[in-house]
Amino acid sequence: MRGRNDWLLVLVILLAVAGVPAASGYTKSPELRFDLYRDYLIVVRGAAGPLKGLNFLLDTGASPTVLDRRLARSLHLDERPGLLAGVNGTVTAGQAIVSSLQLGPMRRDNLPVVVEDLSFFYKALPVHIDGVIGLDVIGQSPFEIDYGAREIRFGPTPSLKNALPLRMERGLPLVDVQLDQSSAKLVLDTGASSLILFAPRTPGAGSPVRISAVLQSSNTMGEFAGKTVWLHSLMLGQAEFRREPAVLVHSRPETNDDFDGLVSPALLGITKIAIDLDRGVFAFSR
């Protein structure tokens, strides 16, 4: 999915959004239905300010939430310039405060958002995307994503077969994994189109994976080139995934020393995930 900067990855906002602290709230219904595209992209309906029936892409790797510039103009948001970290440097991006954002039972008031042109989604999805919603909205409560039922359930999560620690760093959810017996920290990113690994910064540093071919991959905010690699083993907690393809990207973000890549649960064949930020737990079943 190509944006105006082909290497754009929404990872870290470098210029903080100043404004009124965001308030939160809940509605009565604890469930939210979604449509699934390309077997991993989650699209839900929601509202921003007075506008309802909007299409939002849910992405746990988006930090913070992003609104399409066309929607921001319809809402008459006061947009100010800022900087966004990308794979090959920083790009300019607008910043604003949206009066309210509603997604199923989750509501945020006076929410700081990034404003960007999301028109590149037209090439990948049959619906217009009005925004990319991150954990700053949906992470207020524990929640479960059931890919088979196409449903998100908020509130206390069920006990799933596998569980491991989850921690937030700079607004991003990180999990510790083993890649062919090497330790790595990955962003849990429901919007990533594949398992994405950043090559070591140090020239000549070894890699536990085998390079096989060049391809393009993407997360929800851009497209970038990399090389296909094959992992003999990927360990998430006690669960092992064997012979998994990944994309090795040689341009690590200059601002990123905190993690080694992105992992997409759905593309590993995971059917249910549960996230509880307060307890610091990521659980899943296959």
Where are these regions (language model features)?
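Pepsin/retropepsin-fold aspartyl endopeptidases
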Residues: G19-R286
